[in-house]
Amino acid sequence: MAAPWWRAALCECRRWRGFSTSAVLGRRTPPLGPMPNSDIDLSNLERLEKYRSFDRYRRRAEQEAQAPHWWRTYREYFGEKTDPKEKIDIGLPPPKVSRTQQLLERKQAIQELRANVEEERAARLRTASVPLDAVRAEWERTCGPYHKQRLAEYYGLYRDLFHGATFVPRVPLHVAYAVGEDDLMPVYCGNEVTPTEAAQAPEVTYEAEEGSLWTLLLTSLDGHLLEPDAEYLHWLLTNIPGNRVAEGQVTCPYLPPFPARGSGIHRLAFLLFKQDQPIDFSEDARPSPCYQLAQRTFRTFDFYKKHQETMTPAGLSFFQCRWDDSVTYIFHQLLDMREPVFEFVRPPPYHPKQKRFPHRQPLRYLDRYRDSHEPTYGIY
């Protein structure tokens, strides 16, 4: 029996299949532009130009990667969607740095390292030591503020503190809690600090010009017991002269973190603001001591909105905290209240509608739909 005419035509099309025929057969449109390597003559590969060195190949590959294409790459297709709304930058302006001066300093440092015979010998023998303090200082001076900004974005600090506005923490803020007599618990960007370690006010240091004024606050983003969008103010120092934190005005005394039991991990953030002039914070002052949680209810967005004309966020440091035994003491002795305890209640398990004849199902299948908790298995 002869094959139908449409099958013969389909076989003939498949024999000469190209982009246009594939588009017709698969109900797709042809590509919007030239495909990769479409300009290469595959019939005569010997006549293609050879790179003959890796540097020429790398330069050519970089040019091809940076050239505009009509298609999207894998990362562009599956990458994170960018926010169409531009975020407002409320921080300090970036410092003016001469690119020529940077290149000269870098070239001079390379020349000094090459001329240092001892360093070369130590590197060759693998006995060289790297000064970590100098590395950290260089990191904080160059790319560290942008890394901190990315971490704060990841933990949702800008979203919850400033309603989406962002800033680059230009001023390195160093916070450390004293643990015992000799040990310190530093605060970086998201490390975990227990309430026991944060029982006393920390030591805060930063670099500041003489004659400048600063404001330092510590707030808990996830600890409010009544209002989900409110915070608890743990510490507020205002009109700090220079970097002498101890001489600042104690607008709100320090209160240790008290994450409730069963409420998970809480975020606590230190914010450093640079003031343009002395500010009257009498409306934001709390009594000392202040152990009423209603008086410590706080919103960073409203606080900054009130004083945004005279101060600018400049530094940021934050940590995570969860419940331990010292929180019970804070609730009972300091706050003079019963300690709240939370428990995660899981939703009931979902079971599909019971089948009258559960074919190939075990006997335990009936336990899902019984009113009693007595198991079916083991009784026969």
From Swiss-Prot:
Disulfide bond sites: none
Family label: Belongs to the phosphatidylethanolamine-binding protein family. Mitochondrion-specific ribosomal protein mL38 subfamily.
GO cellular component: cytosol; mitochondrial inner membrane; mitochondrial large ribosomal subunit; mitochondrion
One Pfam family matching this protein: PBP
Organism: Homo sapiens (Human)
InterPro entries: PEBP (IPR008914), PEBP-like_sf (IPR036610), PEBP_euk (IPR035810)
Matches recorded under PANTHER family: LARGE RIBOSOMAL SUBUNIT PROTEIN ML38, PHOSPHATIDYLETHANOLAMINE-BINDING PROTEIN
Residue stretches in coiled coil: 99-127
Family annotation (Gene3D superfamilies): PEBP-like (3.90.280.10)
Name used for this protein in its record: Large ribosomal subunit protein mL38
Top-rank taxon: Eukaryota
Subcellular location: Mitochondrion
Residues annotated as transit peptide in the record: 1-26
Any single biological process term in GO: mitochondrial translation
Top-level taxonomy: Eukaryota, Metazoa, Chordata, Craniata, Vertebrata
Subunit structure comment from the entry: Component of the mitochondrial large ribosomal subunit (mt-LSU). Mature mammalian 55S mitochondrial ribosomes consist of a small (28S) and a large (39S) subunit. The 28S small subunit contains a 12S ribosomal RNA (12S mt-rRNA) and 30 different proteins. The 39S large subunit contains a 16S rRNA (16S mt-rRNA), a copy of mitochondrial valine transfer RNA (mt-tRNA(Val)), which plays an integral structural role, and 52 different proteins. mL38 is located at the central protuberance.
Record key words, sorted: Coiled coil, Mitochondrion, Ribonucleoprotein, Ribosomal protein, Transit peptide
Keyword Coiled coil attached: yes
